[in-house]
């Protein structure tokens, strides 16, 4: 919060929850630990931070805001989807792609899969299983790599 910023009420609260982006590759290379119901504030911080960077970014993992928890978020249009403890259980149709990341400089080559199936817990910590394809699948793979300490 900056004095004289003109922000009031809830705008100040949201601005306070926007977290700086972690750029320390040694920290980003650490595998995240499982998330619990005690980590809902981390998910809220991810929502606020992703919204603040929506012109540059479509997904984030908790370690990108300095929290080593297994939580990711991604945007599908205006909707933000949070996944706790996501794991890819099935993948098919590999392809090569260059990706960028707010935490890293430039773009890097990586392999992604056109189709994936993910098991995860939703925001109510209900177990879910969902299949994704295309660009959304690519985003999810990138963010799960973050949780696993894999840097593109």
Residue ranges and their predicted role:
Residues 10, 15-152:
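Positively charged
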């Amino acid at each position: 919060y900056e004095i004289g910023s003109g922000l009031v009420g809830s705008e100040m609260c949201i601005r306070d929850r926007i977290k700086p982006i972690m750029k320390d590759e040694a920290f980003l290379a650490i595998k995240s630990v499982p998330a619990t119901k005690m980590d809902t504030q981390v998910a809220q911080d991810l929502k606020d931070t992703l919204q603040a960077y929506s012109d540059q970014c479509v997904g984030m993992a908790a370690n990108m805001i300095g929290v080593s928890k297994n939580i990711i978020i991604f945007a599908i249009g205006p909707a933000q989807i949070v996944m706790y403890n996501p794991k890819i259980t099935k993948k098919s149709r590999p392809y090569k792609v260059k990706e960028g990341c707010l935490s890293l400089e430039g773009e890097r080559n990586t392999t992604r899969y056109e189709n994936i199936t993910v098991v995860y817990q939703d925001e109510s910590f209900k177990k879910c299983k969902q299949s994704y394809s295309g660009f959304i699948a690519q985003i999810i793979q990138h963010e799960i790599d973050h949780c696993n300490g894999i840097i593109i």
